[in-house]
Amino acid sequence: MGVMWGLISVAIASLAQLSLGFAMMRLPSIAHPLAFISGLGAFNAATLALFAGLAGYLVSVFCWQKTLHMLALSKAYALLSLSYVLVWVASMLLPGLQGAFSLKAMLGVLCIMAGVMLIFLPARS
């Protein structure tokens, strides 16, 4: 049950990260506070994505809390790294997120996946 909550948390956090990325590429830079605030007041897709991403992180924290009650931290923490994989893949597949493929990034993703698999392998008796 703890793994399920962890995977739900990872999925929601990944969606939240993608949503925030979408919003930040479309909203005015926060370096220009007045333009940024007026951009938030426009209530367009970027503003909705920003608030959806923030809400997603909040829900993800609730799921993560449930995970930590049911799963050892050493295993739960390994699940978080799957979010990097999901966001990387989604940023390349979804239009407008400007993700780029590179062999170096692919090697990093493979290392993450191998590490998670090693942590979740059953212990020898």
Curated annotation (Swiss-Prot):
Tell me the gene name.
arnF
Q: GO cellular component terms?
A: plasma membrane
Q: How does it assemble?
A: Heterodimer of ArnE and ArnF.
- Protein name per UniProt: Probable 4-amino-4-deoxy-L-arabinose-phosphoundecaprenol flippase subunit ArnF
Q: Which residues form a coiled coil?
A: none
Main localisation: membrane
Give the Cytoplasmic compartment stretches of this protein. Answer: 1-2, 55-76, 122-125
Q: Which family does it belong to?
A: Belongs to the ArnF family.
Q: Which topology term describes how it sits in the membrane?
A: Multi-pass membrane protein
The pathway that the record names for this protein is:
Bacterial outer membrane biogenesis; lipopolysaccharide biosynthesis
* Purpose of the protein: Translocates 4-amino-4-deoxy-L-arabinose-phosphoundecaprenol (alpha-L-Ara4N-phosphoundecaprenol) from the cytoplasmic to the periplasmic side of the inner membrane.
